[in-house]
Amino acid sequence: MVFHRFEDYDKHYLTPDLSTGLAPVIEGTYMYYCLINKEAGTGSELHYHPNELLIFPIKGKINALVGKERRIVEPGMFVHVPAYARHSMKATEDGDLQYLYIKDQTWTVVGLAEDEAVPDKAMSVDEINKVHDSGVGRTRAEGKSEVIIEGLNNSFYPILNSLDDAPVSGRRTIRVEGERLAFTFTEVPPGDRDEIVNNPHEEFTYMLTGRMSANVDGETKEIGPGDIVEVPRGGARSLVAGNEAPVRHVTISSMPFLENVIDNKKD
């Protein structure tokens, strides 16, 4: 299936002992693609994980910490959390929160406490929820934490003032590349056509505003806000913008480093 909507998937607590985050999870080949939901005033404890994390809020405000830097993040700002970086994401008291949450598949979506060592094997969502519901709690691995707090530089990237910004006059793209995943914001004029015959990376595109005609390997759909388009490596896809402006979407792509790591695990 190449077309998705988050409401078609069951929600799960991803790390219930450390976070109130409830999310549907779409599992690709190289990444986990999720929509985190948090009630006003709730969020996560300080934690980390061995995989890279990309965040883009679509509703509400995040009281966000990455490393030592704290920001109030609203829709229109992208947050990059490098692998092993200490972080915390909490919904402000203003209202409930939703944000796109994408992790690479070198680890699961389950996080680790700030002072916890990295275990030999990551827990699955089902495993951490069973342990949490039992009241016993997880068994921590022996050793020192590998959390990174210092030297992370600026992880916050302004993309839009708000999701309601007026349309721009031309085609605009803003791209941020991490080690394993890349984030691309795109705004296109009506009628814009974007085609790739042999897609070099896995991609998930989330529609923010406007409408487009999408075709992935012969499967077609008219897409609008909240629709997700999954394109596998080597796939063919086209996106044609409709007449309703602005047409905006965000795309997460796998990077060569990640592809090499995951592909070598399969061998």
Explain the meaning of each model-derived region.
Residues 68-83, 218-234:
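Short acidic-glycine-tyrosine-enriched beta hairpin
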